[in-house]
Amino acid sequence: MLFCDDSKKYLKEQNINLKNEFDKDDKRVEKFSLKHQNIYFDYSKNLINDYILKSLLESAEKSSLKDKIKQMFNGAKINSTEHRAVLHTALRDLSSTPLIVDGQDIRQEVTKEKQRVKELVEKVVSGRWRGFSGKKITDIVNIGIGGSDLGPKMVVRALQPYHCTDLKVHFVSNVDADSLLQALHVVDPETTLFIIASKSFSTEETLLNSISAREWLLDHYEDEKAVANHFVAISSKLDKVKEFGIDLEHCYKMWDWVGGRYSLWSSIGMSIAFAIGYDNFEKLLAGAYSVDKHFKETEFSKNIPVIMALLASYYSCTYNSQSQALLPYDERLCYFVDYLQQADMESNGKSVNIAGETVNYQTGVVLWGGVGTNGQHAFHQLLHQGNIFIPVDFIAIATSHHNYDNHQQALLANCFAQSQALMFGQSYDMVYNELLKSGLNETQAKELAAHKVIPGNRPSTTILLDELSPYSLGALIALYEHKIFVQGVLWDINSYDQWGVELGKKLGKNILKAMNDDSSDEYQNLDDSTRQLIAKVKNK
């Protein structure tokens, strides 16, 4: 059954008024909220009632969602265009039941690789791994891009209070040399360990940064043997890793059944373990696993990722929402939006269904946002008074890691106030009367009142965590991962390929050749606009 059918449009005719819904139903919050361990999920401020939710859940039941969930967890190749299983969940699975993919029990492989990463982390932290000059490693530089950067960087920042190893962890991603230089300016070649995170070991940005880092190291040591003491790799291309000068004992696996944007649970998360210690890294995995079990075993009406996906898909299909705002009210989550942008938009930014047919309904949306309270002084104006339909997710943490309780209370008060303001707004009469009370005369009040009206009735969800710990962060990430999966099923698209990024890479290589040789075929085949841009650069 197609989720985005005409029946969803009729649901909009329920004309939900949130204020009225709360006034007439004192059980609304109880009905439209869920709890998973230390995560409270309040979706009562969404444009739904019992009838709409029942209809959405029926659509989920009639879809292939239950079967697709089983297929994913059992290792079926649901990434149909690349003929791959989708098993990032296996990386955090604490069960011992065999899981066979292409004739091999991958649980054994995963366990073995985890042990290798653990041994490396403990070796570096303890000082048993030394730089070429014999000095202890003090800094880790992770060189990667996309999923090899966004996830680990987000987690390392979010869990800063749990840093316990005395290692400073840096991230380099952009091909712009400034990204690399920012790291190199603050590290010592004798005490730095580089992680090259690239499945193909040929990703342009990662390879160029790695080569430059290698040159920087050798400028200091003037001995090729130094590379083995200062570089490890996460890749499936052993020949290229060896050619670079890295000992193959220090090359860690990336499997085809783990997509880059879901890879922080794998060896790609090595930089996380270097920062927070391997025991805390395992707690991150355990938190995600708890949500995997919740997602796999819980009926849809009480299943948080399913409800998240149904609401988002409903707004997309029925209200034509083209974006979603994600507003974490915690500075530690300052990279969370960046991370989820890739996870969501690269997964569901598709225009054909599984069969390769162009769809006639909207799929992925633009996910954007930023940390509170900063956003209140930047883009919240659009959320409150703009005429674009934008559902909002608020993420709040009940307790902080610091002792500034007055700061934390103010932060949470602002978060809850924003969701309340989106829901209730303020009417013309309310504003007009307030202006009269403030001392304005009737003419002045009438002139200003229309500008201060806030329509309200704008949907939001609040996700409240007891604390931001490795365990709870793992759970939070997994909630959104599974939400993305469910939306892909509802829209009948493949959430696990990303063919849209390939053309730009191909053209970028051609243009680079053209920039270096204006007699080349690549230059001759350029359009006039691109040729002029190249000319402008060369003339500077």
From Swiss-Prot:
<keyword id="KW-0963">Cytoplasm</keyword>
<comment type="function">
    <text>Catalyzes the reversible isomerization of glucose-6-phosphate to fructose-6-phosphate.</text>
</comment>
<dbReference type="GO" id="GO:0048029">
    <property type="term" value="F:monosaccharide binding"/>
</dbReference>
<comment type="pathway">
    <text>Carbohydrate biosynthesis; gluconeogenesis.</text>
</comment>
<dbReference type="GO" id="GO:0051156">
    <property type="term" value="P:glucose 6-phosphate metabolic process"/>
</dbReference>
<dbReference type="InterPro" id="IPR001672">
    <property type="entry name" value="G6P_Isomerase"/>
</dbReference>
<dbReference type="InterPro" id="IPR018189">
    <property type="entry name" value="Phosphoglucose_isomerase_CS"/>
</dbReference>
<dbReference type="GO" id="GO:0006096">
    <property type="term" value="P:glycolytic process"/>
</dbReference>
<comment type="pathway">
    <text>Carbohydrate degradation; glycolysis; D-glyceraldehyde 3-phosphate and glycerone phosphate from D-glucose: step 2/4.</text>
</comment>
<keyword id="KW-0413">Isomerase</keyword>
<dbReference type="InterPro" id="IPR035476">
    <property type="entry name" value="SIS_PGI_1"/>
</dbReference>
<dbReference type="InterPro" id="IPR035482">
    <property type="entry name" value="SIS_PGI_2"/>
</dbReference>
<feature type="active site" description="Proton donor">
    <location>
        <position position="346"/>
    </location>
</feature>
<feature type="active site">
    <location>
        <position position="505"/>
    </location>
</feature>
<dbReference type="GO" id="GO:0006094">
    <property type="term" value="P:gluconeogenesis"/>
</dbReference>
<keyword id="KW-0324">Glycolysis</keyword>
<dbReference type="Pfam" id="PF00342">
    <property type="entry name" value="PGI"/>
</dbReference>
<keyword id="KW-0312">Gluconeogenesis</keyword>
<dbReference type="GO" id="GO:0004347">
    <property type="term" value="F:glucose-6-phosphate isomerase activity"/>
</dbReference>
<dbReference type="InterPro" id="IPR023096">
    <property type="entry name" value="G6P_Isomerase_C"/>
</dbReference>
<dbReference type="GO" id="GO:0097367">
    <property type="term" value="F:carbohydrate derivative binding"/>
</dbReference>
<protein>
    <recommendedName>
        <fullName>Glucose-6-phosphate isomerase</fullName>
        <ecNumber>5.3.1.9</ecNumber>
    </recommendedName>
</protein>
<dbReference type="GO" id="GO:0005829">
    <property type="term" value="C:cytosol"/>
</dbReference>
<feature type="active site">
    <location>
        <position position="377"/>
    </location>
</feature>
<dbReference type="InterPro" id="IPR046348">
    <property type="entry name" value="SIS_dom_sf"/>
</dbReference>
<comment type="similarity">
    <text>Belongs to the GPI family.</text>
</comment>
